C-alpha cells in the first residue's frame, strides 16, 4: 500500500516561482510521452506556446472558468482585537463561509469589522468554517474591499500584476479562493492557434477552495479527509465530450480542477447507472494510484507540492515512476514550480496503477 512518504521529494526553494512571467505562454511545457509501457517516458522540453502542436484536430480541451475572489480580509473585533478572514465560499447573496484567524474564536452574534469598510455578523459554525452575514451583496463587497489570496508559498503581498496574472483570461464565474493554475498559461494567441488547428474547447466551473493547499497529515492515505468543492457541468460540455468520443478525439483536462470535476461527475453517474449528464454538485473525490479514469485522456497541469493530493492525482493518471522521472528532470532542468510555475502535458496510462489504494 502506498503511503504519504511515497509522494515526497526535495525541491530547491529557488525553483518555487514567486511571480508570473511577463508573457503567459512564455512558460515552459514538459511534454511527457509515456505511451510505450516497455520504455522509460520520453521527456520533451517545450515552450507553452507550442501546445497546439502537441494536440490533434478533433481533440477537446476542457477549461475551468472559475474566477478568483479577493477573499482575504484583515479586520478587528469590537474589542479591537485583530482578525484575519479568508472567505471559503459564497453560499447566498449576503452569506459566506469563512476561515477566521483570531486570538479566540468569535461566538455567534459577534460583529467583525472588515477592511475598515463594513461589518459582518458571525453566524453558526459549519466546521471548519464560520458563517458570515454581510450587510449587502457578498460578491460586490468582496471585490471592492478584499485582497487577492495568493498561495502561502508566494512571499510577496498581492499587487496589481497579481490581480491580472492570478486570473485566467477566460475566468467568468466568481467563487474560487485559488486559481486553476494550469489555465494561467493560456493567452489569446494560444487559444487562437488551438482553434485554427481544429481543437474544440469547452468549460466547466469548479470553485477551488482553500483546501487545495491543505497538507496531508496522515501517513496512511486512507485516513485523509479530502476537502469538498462545488462544481457544475453543462449540457453543452457533456454533448461536446460525447461528440469527441464519437470522432475518436481525446478529452484533455486543463488542470487538476477540471479533472476532478469531470471524473467526479462520471464516477457518480456510473454509480447511479446513468450516462454522464449536466450536473451541479459537491465533490470530495480523492484520486490516488489505482483509480480508474473514466473521462480524461490527457492533462495539462503545473508542478505540484511534495506530499500533496494533486501530486497523488497526477501519479494516478500517468504512473508513479513516470511522474518521479518527470519531476527529477524538471528539477535538474530548473523548471519553475507551483502556481506561477511551468506546466506539464501528461497522457493517461491505463496501467498506471503500479500500486493501488482504494481505486473505484
From Swiss-Prot:
GO terms for cellular component: cytoplasm. Its main location: cytoplasm. One of its GO terms (molecular function) is S-adenosylmethionine:tRNA ribosyltransferase-isomerase activity. The gene is queA. Monomer. Pathway: tRNA modification; tRNA-queuosine biosynthesis. Keywords: Cytoplasm, Queuosine biosynthesis, S-adenosyl-L-methionine, Transferase. Disulfide bonds: none annotated. Its EC number is 2.4.99.17. Transfers and isomerizes the ribose moiety from AdoMet to the 7-aminomethyl group of 7-deazaguanine (preQ1-tRNA) to give epoxyqueuosine (oQ-tRNA). It comes from the Bacteria. InterPro entries: QueA, QueA_dom1, QueA_dom2, QueA_sf. The lineage of its organism: Bacteria, Pseudomonadati, Pseudomonadota, Betaproteobacteria, Burkholderiales. Belongs to the QueA family. GO terms for biological process: queuosine biosynthetic process; tRNA wobble guanine modification. It catalyses: 7-aminomethyl-7-carbaguanosine(34) in tRNA + S-adenosyl-L-methionine = epoxyqueuosine(34) in tRNA + adenine + L-methionine + 2 H(+). This is S-adenosylmethionine:tRNA ribosyltransferase-isomerase. It is found in: Cytoplasm.
Amino acid at each position: 500500500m502506498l503511503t504519504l512518504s511515497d509522494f515526497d521529494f526535495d525541491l530547491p526553494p529557488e525553483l518555487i516561482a514567486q511571480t508570473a512571467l511577463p508573457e503567459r505562454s512564455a512558460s515552459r511545457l514538459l511534454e511527457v510521452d509515456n505511451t510505450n509501457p516497455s520504455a522509460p517516458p520520453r521527456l520533451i522540453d517545450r515552450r507553452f506556446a507550442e501546445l497546439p502542436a502537441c494536440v490533434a484536430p478533433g481533440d477537446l480541451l476542457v477549461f475551468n472558468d472559475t474566477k478568483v475572489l479577493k477573499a482575504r480580509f484583515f479586520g478587528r473585533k469590537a474589542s479591537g482585537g485583530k482578525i484575519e478572514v479568508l472567505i471559503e465560499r459564497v453560499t447566498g447573496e449576503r452569506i459566506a463561509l469563512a476561515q477566521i484567524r483570531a486570538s479566540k474564536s468569535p461566538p455567534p452574534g459577534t460583529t467583525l469589522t472588515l477592511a475598515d469598510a463594513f461589518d459582518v455578523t458571525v453566524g453558526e459554525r459549519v466546521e471548519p468554517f464560520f458563517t458570515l452575514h454581510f450587510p449587502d451583496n457578498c460578491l460586490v463587497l468582496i471585490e471592492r474591499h478584499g485582497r487577492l489570496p495568493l498561495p502561502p508559498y508566494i512571499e510577496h503581498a498581492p499587487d496589481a500584476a497579481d490581480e491580472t496574472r492570478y486570473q485566467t483570461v477566460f475566468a467568468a464565474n466568481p467563487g474560487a479562493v485559488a486559481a486553476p493554475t494550469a489555465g494561467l498559461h493560456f493567452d489569446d494567441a494560444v487559444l487562437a492557434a488551438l482553434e485554427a488547428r481544429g481543437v474544440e474547447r469547452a468549460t466547466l466551473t469548479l470553485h477551488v477552495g482553500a483546501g487545495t493547499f491543505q497538507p496531508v497529515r496522515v501517513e496512511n492515505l486512507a485516513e485523509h479527509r479530502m476537502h469538498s468543492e462545488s462544481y457544475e457541468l453543462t449540457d453543452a460540455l457533456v454533448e461536446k465530450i460525447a461528440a469527441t468520443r464519437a470522432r475518436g478525439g481525446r478529452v484533455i483536462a486543463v488542470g487538476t480542477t477540471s479533472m476532478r470535476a469531470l471524473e467526479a461527475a462520471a464516477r457518480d453517474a456510473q454509480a447511479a447507472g446513468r450516462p454522464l449528464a449536466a450536473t451541479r454538485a459537491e465533490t470530495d473525490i480523492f484520486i490516488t494510484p489505482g483509480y480508474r479514469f473514466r473521462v480524461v485522456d490527457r492533462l495539462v497541469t503545473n508542478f505540484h507540492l511534495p506530499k500533496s493530493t494533486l501530486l497523488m492525482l497526477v501519479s494516478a493518471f500517468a504512473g508513479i515512476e513516470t511522474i518521479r522521472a518527470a519531476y527529477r528532470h524538471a528539477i535538474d532542468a530548473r523548471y519553475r514550480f507551483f502556481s506561477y510555475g511551468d506546466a506539464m502535458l501528461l497522457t493517461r496510462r491505463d496501467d498506471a496503477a503500479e500500486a493501488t489504494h482504494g481505486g473505484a
